[in-house]
Design a protein with these regions (language model features):
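A glycine-rich, Thr/Ser-enriched phosphate-binding loop motif common to dinucleotide/cofactor-binding enzymes
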Residues: 92-110
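N-terminal ligand-binding/catalytic initiation module
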Residues: 1-87
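Short, surface-exposed connector motifs at secondary-structure boundaries
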Residues: 57-58, 87-88, 142-148
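Gly/Ser/Thr-rich loops at beta-strand to alpha-helix junctions
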Residues: 67-71, 97-101, 129-134, 154-156
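Solvent-exposed, charged interface segments at domain starts and junctions
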Residues: 39-46, 104-108, 128-133
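Short glycine-rich or small-residue beta-strand-to-loop segments that form or flank ligand, phosphate
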Residues: 61-65, 90-94, 125-127, 149
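Glycine-rich phosphate/diphosphate-binding loop of Rossmann-like nucleotide-binding domains
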Residues: 111-158
């Protein structure tokens, strides 16, 4: 069974970077669509989940990317809504690389502080943290038990 990745990108052109990473990560085929909006998602996802039985869907995945994180979150929600019972595939959401960057930074920090990565009860300051990477990093740190302060260089934060 070939491993397939449906790449849904909210930017007009699908990211070449994301496609290369997908192939290097082991995908046999990557089907990339650019300019994806919520209304496009259902039929694309159904194309993935209806062509393979539930036991074979482990060889299919959906990646949501693009530069606009808010648009990506909407596409992600539409992907989840398109699933039907056991007819679902693994989904990765990483618009603008915000999730992978935050996870890498937090992982590095946790292991720099403690060999076991334990940061419970520690204080963490996320500087310039009001953007997508900083907010995700702050959430991960808080979830791991740190007391988190977020700073910003903007006078107003949405």
């Amino acid at each position: 069974m070939r491993t397939l990745l449906l790449h849904l990108d909210t930017s007009p052109r699908p990211s070449v970077f994301d496609r290369i990473v997908a192939y290097d990560g082991g995908a046999d085929a990557v089907m990339s669509y650019g300019g994806v909006v919520e209304g496009d998602v259902r039929d694309l996802v159904h194309g993935v989940i209806f062509t393979r039985g539930p036991k074979d869907l482990h060889s299919s995945a959906i990646f949501v990317g693009g530069a606009d994180i808010v648009a990506g979150e909407k596409v992600l929600a539409a992907v989840r809504q398109a699933f039907m019972g056991p007819l679902r595939a693994s989904v990765l959401f990483d618009s603008n690389g915000s999730n992978t960057t935050a996870v890498a930074a937090v992982s590095k920090l946790r292991h720099a502080v403690s060999p076991e990565g334990d940061i419970r009860g520690r204080r963490a300051v996320v500087t310039a943290g009001s953007g997508p990477v900083g907010l995700r990093a702050a959430g991960l740190l808080a979830r791991a038990g740190a007391a988190v302060t977020v700073t910003t260089r903007r006078m107003s934060v949405k």
